């Protein structure tokens, strides 16, 4: 539940991060 630097609007999240709300990348 920590916000990652990248977003997932135009590309998928990187590494341990997952896409939330189709907008912001989060990790545990």
Swiss-Prot record:
Cross-link entry Cyclopeptide (Asp-Asn), positions: 1-28
Keyword set includes Zinc: no
GO biological process, one term: defense response
Tissue distribution: Expressed in root nodules but not in seed.
UniProt PTM comment: Contains 3 disulfide bonds.
Keyword field: Disulfide bond, Knottin, Plant defense
Family affiliation: Belongs to the cyclotide family.
Name of this chain's protein: Cliotide T21
The organism of origin for this protein: Clitoria ternatea (Butterfly pea)
């Amino acid at each position: 539940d920590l916000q990652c630097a990248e977003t997932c609007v135009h590309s998928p999240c990187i590494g341990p991060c997952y896409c939330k709300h189709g907008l912001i990348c989060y990790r545990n």
